[in-house]
Design a protein with these regions (language model features):
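Core SAM-dependent methyltransferase catalytic element
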Residues: 195-198, 268-282
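A short SAM/SAH-binding and catalytic strip from SAM-dependent methyltransferases
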Residues: 110-123
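A short glycine-rich, Lys/Arg-flanked "PGG" loop and its adjoining helix->strand segment in the class I
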Residues: 125-140
């Protein structure tokens, strides 16, 4: 398998849906600023539960078409179940497919979206060349990566949060084929340039949430960030003192859980790498 999302003890569909719903308020703006043509054909590589594929399909209108691909059958079925019936037949389709071996003909789509997936693909340049193969000359390739810059989830505890983030980077070294996910995210621009994609606009978006948190925001921060990402998988990489401090702030039943604070806020960055032309030689 060419790409996997590691560490999903709660199940990948649940984790991905939580992240997408957390990002939903800003997703419309991010997609609108891409300027995708009405009636265009697009591909979502690593579509997850299909929410971004749905939003992209809505953006290109009733004459447009979006295909979402995932390497595992269960994820394709999950996307179909969650959003597959929300648009008229033919506008949104989900297929099994891999980012390094896309089941589409050459130059068959107007644009390609890859959201929070490229850093999971060990064969990065192979995937990017495959992206170029399926996008028509003059089309668009869009890579979205969350947390190229580190997020802030523990305001007032900067040193502890940095150590937790460092532990998470170390944990993803094996999952990332010897390079951490953070390193892969931060070298996205270099990877694009290495395959001849030099016409790249980079946009950064800063998501801000503050107390009282909405249900989707609380669900993502508590269950995906604190419990899944910063949970048992990091325990051996933190000192006992740091683990205890993390537990006091992050465990849902802790009276000191930071999400209980009326002053709580978080900052969460998203970076979009927008390649406006794919006409250069392969």
């Amino acid at each position: 398998m060419s790409h996997q999302r590691g560490g999903d003890s709660e199940g990948p569909q649940t984790s991905l849906e939580r992240m997408n719903r957390f990002q939903a308020p800003e997703a419309g703006r991010i997609i609108a600023e891409l300027g995708l043509p009405q009636g265009s054909r697009g591909l979502d590589v690593g579509c997850g539960v299909g929410l971004y594929a749905l939003w992209l399909a809505e953006a290109v209108g009733s004459a447009g078409r979006v295909v979402g691909i995932e390497p595992e059958t269960e994820r394709v079925e999950a996307a179909r179940a969650l959003v597959g019936g929300q648009l008229a037949s033919g506008r949104l389709e989900f297929r099994q497919g891999d980012g390094t071996n896309i089941p589409l003909p050459d130059r068959s789509v107007d644009w390609l979206w890859c959201g929070d997936v490229l850093h999971h693909i060990v064969e990065t340049q192979l995937a990017l060349r495959e992206f170029r193969r399926v996008v028509r000359p003059g089309g668009q390739i869009i890579i979205k990566e969350s947390q190229v810059l580190s997020a802030l989830f523990l305001p007032g505890h900067p040193e502890l949060e940095r150590r937790i983030q460092l532990a998470e980077i170390r944990r993803t070294l094996d999952e990332g084929g010897g390079r951490s996910f953070q390193e892969r995210r931060q070298t996205t621009l270099a990877s694009l340039r290495a395959v001849g994609l030099t016409d790249v606009a980079v946009r950064n978006y800063l998501l801000q949430r503050r107390a009282p948190l909405g249900a989707a925001d609380h669900d993502y921060i508590q269950n995906t960030v604190f419990t899944r990402n910063w949970g048992a998988r990091l325990r051996e990489l933190l000192t006992p003192a740091d683990w205890d401090a993390r537990s006091a702030l992050c465990e849902p039943d802790s009276p000191k859980n930071i999400l209980r604070s009326p002053d709580y806020f978080c900052l969460y960055p998203i970076t979009v790498f927008h390649c406006g032309s794919t006409a250069a030689a392969r």
